[in-house]
Amino acid sequence: MYIEENERYIYYYLIFSIWFYILYPFLDIILNNITKYKTINPKHKQQYFISNLVKGTILGLITPHSYFILYNYIFYNIWDLNEIKIMASLYASIDLVSLFQVNKMQTTTIVHHSMVQVFYIISLLCFNFNEHEISTPIVIYAIFSTFAYMVNAYLALRLILNVKYLKLFATISSIIYQFCCTLNWSYQCYYLYLSNINFIVKLIYSIVIMT
């Protein structure tokens, strides 16, 4: 277990989570000044709106940095553990807070957010996010999910946007999402086929990401 060397990243994870948890009611107060937000019904969808707005915004902001992590790994074989661990802490904390802040969340979303926490903890404490472990495809999966930030933005904005703009936003989001999925799944299959990772670990990981 890599507990001692990752102590500060666990603190990052907790600090990010607390910050996002506090952010929800703060945003709710601000957004209640917007008529279209106030009229969102049922009311629990307002938390759904905030959840996707926060996630879409944060993922959008870290997309350029995620791109450089991926670029450096592919072309220069640079696997920057510090950057990866910080980004992973941020990514996981967003989904953790959603589990507590969003009421009546769909079961599939609950499972997804929960598995993000499991993969984060396992990758950090069991594998130390080391290259050539199961952590590698997990990180790449997260990076491509980051690139698809417009999907989360769309899930929020569809509740308040004009239909005219919503169709354009939906089209762009769909194209980006499909493109990211194609590249991501191609890499996942390629890596899992060629890597020397334990077969049972590969099998469990494959089953989880396909559910």
What residues fall within each predicted segment?
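N-terminal signal-anchor/initial transmembrane insertion module
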Residues: M1-N103, N196-T211
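C-terminal transmembrane module of eukaryotic multi-pass membrane proteins
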Residues: V151-T211
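Membrane-proximal helix-loop-helix units in multi-pass membrane proteins
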Residues: F100-V163
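Juxtamembrane helix-loop boundaries in multi-pass membrane proteins
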Residues: I40-I58, T108-F119, K164-Q178
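Hydrophobic alpha-helical transmembrane segments of multi-pass membrane proteins
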Residues: L14, D80, I140-I143, S173-I176
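Helical transmembrane-bundle signal
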Residues: L59-I62, Y91-S98, V116, Y120-S123, ...
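Hydrophobic alpha-helical segments
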Residues: I69, C126-F127, L192
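Non-cytosolic membrane-interface motifs at loop->transmembrane helix junctions
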Residues: I78-W79, T108-H112, T136, K167, ...
